[in-house]
Amino acid sequence: LALPKERVLDFEVTHRLVDGGAEVDYTVTTNGSHDVTVEVLDGTTKVAEASGKTGTLKITNAKLWNVHAAYLYNFVIRITDGHAVIDEYFDKIGIRTFEVKDGHFLLNGKPVYLRGFGKHEDSDIRGRGLDLATVKRDYELMKWIGANCFRTSHYPYAEELYQMADEEGFLIIDEVPAVGFMQSTMNFLAANQGNGKKVGYFEKETTPKLLENHKAALTDMITRDKNHASVIAWSILNEPQCTSEGTEAYFKPLFDLAHELDPQKRPRTYAIV
């Protein structure tokens, strides 16, 4: 893989709806100091542009991204030296807002009811191997049954699934690979037999290293998926032990980190039964 010596490393966007239009705040990260330009295109028609590594793109009569009515704009970043293009990066963005307010999920300021599944990335054809035809079939089946949302149980999926969710207008609760954080009954009894002392899952000597690895996995997921319009929330854990004395001390740094890393400040959650 050949890369320019000076190149685009990352970018992030946030959206605001303003008087029938939209404002897109952006930040571009590069490994150099040359000029950066950003364009938003509706198909091949330029609808907004700005210069600099940070800025705001103003789009009049913006076409919003919505459930089963997805609309994606082309997003182009260029690093230039005079008239010479040093690097060029293309992506697609959907303009939408998502928040929790007064007990409601609001998509573009309007209530939306989440209907769907805790999904798994597998099939009878490829197992967990990526098969785009199978992925497309799954989206069509979910639409047929009336779903609009799924949780990536229990790990981030292949990026192509998020790209297709952006295109199909599906909502994703993106889950970090943190599952099984619970003492089994037999292990709990064996670990505490005869001493009368209860040791919860998050009071073990391995917990600091576990938390370090958990933070790294969470960082990787949010860094990769933060610009997908389909991603509306971060799931921090799946069915963890919640009665351990160390539960809050373990959970809180993760929830705080997710809020810090995400420019769009999506809701944070975890799955529990």
Per-region residue spans from a language model:
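A general secondary-structure junction signal
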Residues: 235-238, 272
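Secreted/periplasmic carbohydrate-active enzymes, especially glycoside hydrolases
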Residues: 1-172, 217, 232-233, 249-253, ...
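Active-site cleft segment of glycoside hydrolase catalytic domains centered on the general acid/base Glu
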Residues: 201-211, 237-259
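Short Asp/Glu-rich motifs
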Residues: 124, 161-162, 183-185, 244
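Catalytic-site neighborhoods of secreted/periplasmic enzymes
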Residues: 181-184, 268-273
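Solvent-exposed loop/turn segments at secondary-structure junctions
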Residues: 156-158, 178-180, 238-242
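Alpha-helical structural elements of signaling/regulatory helical domains
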Residues: 226-227, 246
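Aromatic- and acidic-residue-enriched carbohydrate-binding clefts of CAZyme catalytic domains
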Residues: 115-120, 128, 175-222, 226, ...
